[in-house]
């Protein structure tokens, strides 16, 4: 048997690759097989699918010496019961199970056949273990009046293994080397040192920071910090200089200028007050590093 397989492989020219379409499998190869006509290049073997295991198809259906990922063969449907229409798809090691809906095969807008998908399961139904082996079974819908009745049961098959995808490692959304701490820990060392060390003396500026640290422990740091960042002036760029006004200024424009100047002074004073909180916050960091 091996000698026959070797002679069969040698008859295939080097570099030959067999990749027929669904239409070609049904409209040419299967049609000629049912009609018992000669096929120009006989590269599709006859296999009794239900007397062979799927992993043996690679050697039995090899075409030439090129590496293959698909294997083609003719098979004859074996009825499960003599008077029934159900097909027997059991092998020694398992069984083939149909899955999904059959797909129509058209040639020049004419329905010529259907494609059925089969999956191989190890063991016995209904407790079989699903494998990666899949078969596309093509059967003809055309009438073959001149063909013997026994030839109507031929199908052409494409066997292949389902590609297994390797899961890729998800990117981490955070860097484990970075430290994370909440706002309350920023001033906590300074407050803890004052509570646990009786000899600790704080300057008036440090005492003010300690009082603010107590507010942080009570969850009041957000309101203190938001006083600085919630101001609309904080995110605005400095205003451009306005063009010089005409020499003649009406009393209304003078009043508007005085009001604008007064508002700018109040806004500037508010910005200074807001910045003091941030300055105190930054100063606390230098104090903590100095104490260490």
Swiss-Prot record:
Residues 12-162 form the NAC domain. PROSITE patterns: NAC. Residues 112-168 bind DNA. It holds the Pfam family NAM. Residues 260-269 have a biased composition (Basic and acidic residues). InterPro entries: NAC-dom, NAC_dom_sf. It comes from the Eukaryota. Residues 237-259 have a biased composition (Polar residues). The NAC domain includes a DNA binding domain and a dimerization domain. This is NAC domain-containing protein 105. It comes from Arabidopsis thaliana. The gene is NAC105.
